[in-house]
């Protein structure tokens, strides 16, 4: 019995030694395989350069998350990695102009102006026509200045620069601003003013106004006994303007009134002295 127990203890010790040796050999084999193949650092760098969905999980169960979400390869505070910039192929247009700082393809500034430092993206037929017209105008100006040095430059500039007639202004929902011809409107206004002046200066209108004035001023009994000849002579002779209308009695606040006409309110010192004092009964 004692001999069997001793053999069992030796077998267990040997088994433990074998397990320990196997566990010690596994990391060495992993290091050898990693040294023969690509290292994990290069794999991690490659993963950082690409867009991947999840985090990187290492064999030691450590989780490494991507520090930069965007593929711009930027470090903190706006700095870029100098090692990664060499592998990037920059997209360029028309020479050495970089595409990245240009936001819009039209290269336009505010208020329709273009950046003079950058060339135009596309050349149209309108640009060619404009350039040709400018060259022709400059040649004509040089010829005119060479032949007639004392000529009037104002007439030349008036002929060269003419205002372009714009299209009629359009409003929203298909409406348009009504455009009237200026000549017709001016002629109508002139004719209307001439007609008004002729009416004011005519004898018929003046007689009608004088008749209205006399109708409201002369009492009815006097107007009934007046002869037709007298009225005609009065109309011909009376060229005075309308008299100022007599104002109504002065009104005070809160509905009160003086009860007197404006002519009766103020009396001169002579009138006040001539008025006898009231006697008390």
Swiss-Prot record:
Q: Where is the signal peptide?
A: 1-30
Q: Which residues carry this modification: Phenylalanine amide?
A: 77, 111
For the modification Tryptophan amide, the affected residues are: 173, 254
The tissues where this chain's protein is expressed are given as: Stage 17 embryos show expression in the two brain hemispheres (neural cells located in the dorsal posterior region), the connected ventral ganglion (pairs of neural cells along the ventral midline) and the peripheral nervous system (expressed in the antennal-maxillary sensory cells). In the brain hemispheres of the feeding third instar larva, expression in neural cells is located in the dorsal-anterior region of the protocerebrum.
Positions with biased composition (Polar residues): 271-281
The molecular function GO annotations come to: neuropeptide hormone activity; neuropeptide receptor binding; receptor ligand activity
Question: Propeptide positions in this record?
Answer: 31-64, 115-165, 176-246, 257-281
* Family of this protein: Belongs to the NPY family.
Another remark in the UniProt entry says: Flies overexpressing sNPF are heavier and bigger than wild-type. But loss-of-function flies are not smaller than wild-type.
Function of this protein? Plays a role in controlling food intake and regulating body size.
Q: What is the official name of this protein in its record?
A: Short neuropeptide F
Q: Which organism is it from?
A: Drosophila melanogaster
The gene designation is sNPF
């Amino acid at each position: 019995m004692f001999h069997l127990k001793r053999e069992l203890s030796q077998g267990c010790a040997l088994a433990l030694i074998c397990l320990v040796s196997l566990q010690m050999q596994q990391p060495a084999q992993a290091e050898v395989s990693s040294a023969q193949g690509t290292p994990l650092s290069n794999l991690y760098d490659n993963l950082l350069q690409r867009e991947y969905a999840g985090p990187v999980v290492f064999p030691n169960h450590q989780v490494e998350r991507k520090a930069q979400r965007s593929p711009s390869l930027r470090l903190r505070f706006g700095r870029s990695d100098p090692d990664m910039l060499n592998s990037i192929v920059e997209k360029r247009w028309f020479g050495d102009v970089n595409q990245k700082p240009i936001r819009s393809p039209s290269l336009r500034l505010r208020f329709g102006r273009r950046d003079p430092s950058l060339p135009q993206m596309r050349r149209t037929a309108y640009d060619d026509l404009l350039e040709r017209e400018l060259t022709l105008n400059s040649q004509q100006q040089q010829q005119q200045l060479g032949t007639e040095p004392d000529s009037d430059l104002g007439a030349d500039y008036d002929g060269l620069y003419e205002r372009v007639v714009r299209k009629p202004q359009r409003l929203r929902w298909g409406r348009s601003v009504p455009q009237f011809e200026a000549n017709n409107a001016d002629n109508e206004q002139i004719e209307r003013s001439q007609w008004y002046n002729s009416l004011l200066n005519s004898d018929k209108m003046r007689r009608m106004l004088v008749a209205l004035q006399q109708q409201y001023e002369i009492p009815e009994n006097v107007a009934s006994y007046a002869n037709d000849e007298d009225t005609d002579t009065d109309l011909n002779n009376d060229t005075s303007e309308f008299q100022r209308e007599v104002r109504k009695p002065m009104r005070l606040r809160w509905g009160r009134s003086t009860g007197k006409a404006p002519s009766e309110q103020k009396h001169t010192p002579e009138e006040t002295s001539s008025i006898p004092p009231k006697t008390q009964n």
